[in-house]
Amino acid sequence: MEFPDLGAHCSEPSCQRLDFLPLKCDACSGIFCADHVAYAQHHCGSAYQKDIQVPVCPLCNVPVPVARGEPPDRAVGEHIDRDCRSDPAQQKRKIFTNKCERAGCRQREMMKLTCERCSRNFCIKHRHPLDHDCSGEGHPTSRAGLAAISRAQAVASTSTVPSPSQTMPSCTSPSRATTRSPSWTAPPVIALQNGLSEDEALQRALEMSLAETKPQVPSCQEEEDLALAQALSASEAEYQRQQAQSRSSKPSNCSLC
């Protein structure tokens, strides 16, 4: 006697047996008999969801817990950086000693990355003020502005000390008069920041630097070197001309029979 209303048929296409005590697959939620309830027996397509494996640290052979959906490589890497007790991991931990001070971040870096506003240490991902919610006040001077200010300080220090070329008497020849360039005194560095923004101060410093690099009047030593070079060139040309004349005036020893 059959009871078609009792139990359920096996979902395996090759079986379809009526089982009074059917079993439900916890992966694909299919109904199967006792012979096909295993994942491998009915070729379950959702068996990978139940195949949970715990990765093992390759250095200390300790199982590393991994949250669902998290890549195991990331969990193993964080374990090596923080909790691994092996010698290579501890040696690496001594190198990466600069811990990020942002809340919730455990990244460590080899060098310090200090914020210019709050003077705190952060990792590469959180080094910008917007990435770590910087609480520092004020707008810091950029590196270009600092470089321009340092150049202006160097120009101001060198312009106050008289150079040896200014103290020496000018050697002017009667046929050639040299003009002395007017002395230029750089304004103090404080004037760069007095009432000027950072961009204006940078532009002012660049103009001062370009003014310092203008070509100067040649010195006496340069004029003497130039005259000596011209004299040597003229003597060489005269010697070659005399040699050419002597060769042309020399009689030929060849005779025709």
Swiss-Prot record:
GO BP of this protein: proteasome-mediated ubiquitin-dependent protein catabolic process; protein targeting to ER; regulation of insulin-like growth factor receptor signaling pathway; SRP-dependent cotranslational protein targeting to membrane, translocation
Motif (CAAX motif): 254-257
InterPro entries to which the protein is assigned, alphabetical: AN1-like_Znf, UIM_dom, Znf_AN1
Pfam family, any one: zf-C2H2_ZFAND2
Domain of life: Eukaryota
Amino acids binding Zn(2+) 1: C10, C15, C33, H36
VCP/p97-interacting motif (VIM), as annotated region: 141-151
Induction, as annotated: Down-regulated by the miRNA miR-125a-3p in myelo-proliferative neoplasms.
Comp. bias intervals (Low complexity): 172-186
Localisation: Endoplasmic reticulum membrane
Cellular component GO terms held in the UniProt record: cytoplasm; endoplasmic reticulum; endoplasmic reticulum membrane; membrane; proteasome complex
Region listing for Disordered, in residue ranges: 153-187
GO molecular function annotation: K48-linked polyubiquitin modification-dependent protein binding; ubiquitin binding; zinc ion binding
Positions with a binding annotation for Zn(2+) 3: C100, C105, C123, H126
Membrane topology summary: Lipid-anchor
Modified residues (Phosphoserine): S163, S173
Residues binding Zn(2+) 2, per UniProt: C25, C28, H42, C44
Modified residue annotations for Cysteine methyl ester: C254
Record text on subunit structure and interactions: Binds 'Lys-48'-linked polyubiquitin chains of ubiquitinated proteins. Associates with the proteasome complex; upon exposure to arsenite. Interacts (via VIM motif) with VCP; the interaction is direct. Interacts with BAG6. Interacts with IGF1R (nascent precursor form). Interacts with DERL1, FAF2, NPLOC4 and UFD1; probably through VCP.
This protein's domain notes: The UIM domains specifically bind 'Lys-48'-linked ubiquitin polymers. The UIM domains mediate interaction with polyubiquitinated proteins.
Protein name as catalogued: AN1-type zinc finger protein 2B
